[in-house]
From Swiss-Prot:
Organism this protein belongs to: Homo sapiens (Human)
Membrane-protein topology: Multi-pass membrane protein
N-acetylmethionine carried by residues: M1
Protein name per Swiss-Prot or TrEMBL: Transmembrane protein 208
Subcellular location(s) of the protein: Endoplasmic reticulum membrane
Biological function: May function as a negative regulator of endoplasmic reticulum-stress induced autophagy.
Length: 173
C-alpha cells in the first residue's frame, strides 16, 4: 500500500550519499563489462581480434568516459571551508532527469559490449541510443514546436464574442 500524503523530501546529506553509491555502482558495471570484453575478446581470441574489436573497445571507453564524467560532475558536492556539506549535488536518482538517460547509455553500452564477445554485429543494437535521443527530441522539443498554435489573437477574439453574447442575453432579460 502506498503511503498517504506528500512524499518526503530528501536532505543534502542523503542525496550526497546516494549519489556516491550510484557512481560506485556504475563504475563497477563499467569495469566489469570492460574486464569481460578484454578477457574474452582480446586475451582468449587475441589471434582473431580484428580492427573492429579494437575500435569497439575504443568507442565503448569513450562512451563510458563521457557518461561517467557527466554524471560525476552533476553529482559534485560543495563543501564549506570548515568541511560542512553545503550542497549535495544534483540528484542522480531523480526520475526523468539527464542522469537517468546517462545511466541508460552506460547500461546499454555494457550489455552490447559483453554480448559483442559472441558477435560484432551486436554493436548494431547501440543504434537504440541515438534512436531514443531522436524520439525524446521529437516528443519534448520539435513536436510541440511544430504543432503549437501560431497566434494568440484567437483567445482575444473569443473573449470579445463572449462579452457580446453576454450583453445580448442581458438585453433579452
Amino acid at each position: 500500500m502506498a503511503p498517504k500524503g506528500k512524499v518526503g523530501t530528501r536532505g543534502k546529506k542523503q542525496i550526497f550519499e546516494e549519489n556516491r553509491e550510484t557512481l560506485k555502482f556504475y563504475l563497477r558495471i563499467i569495469l566489469g563489462a570492460n574486464a569481460i570484453y578484454c578477457l574474452v575478446t582480446l586475451v582468449f581470441f587475441y589471434s582473431s581480434a580484428s580492427f573492429w574489436a579494437w575500435l569497439a573497445l575504443g568507442f565503448s571507453l569513450a562512451v563510458y568516459g563521457a557518461s561517467y564524467h557527466s554524471m560525476s560532475s552533476m553529482a559534485r558536492a560543495a563543501f564549506s571551508e570548515d568541511g560542512a556539506l553545503m550542497d549535495g549535488g544534483m540528484d542522480l536518482n531523480m526520475e526523468q532527469g539527464m542522469a537517468e538517460h546517462l545511466k541508460d547509455v552506460i547500461l546499454l553500452t555494457a550489455i552490447v559490449q559483453v554480448l559483442s564477445c559472441f558477435s560484432l554485429y551486436v554493436w548494431s543494437f547501440w543504434l537504440l541510443a541515438p534512436g531514443r535521443a531522436l524520439y525524446l527530441l521529437w516528443v519534448n522539443v520539435l513536436g510541440p514546436w511544430f504543432t503549437a498554435d501560431s497566434g494568440t489573437p484567437a483567445p482575444e477574439h473569443n473573449e470579445k464574442r463572449q462579452r457580446r453574447q453576454e450583453r445580448r442575453q442581458m438585453k433579452r432579460l
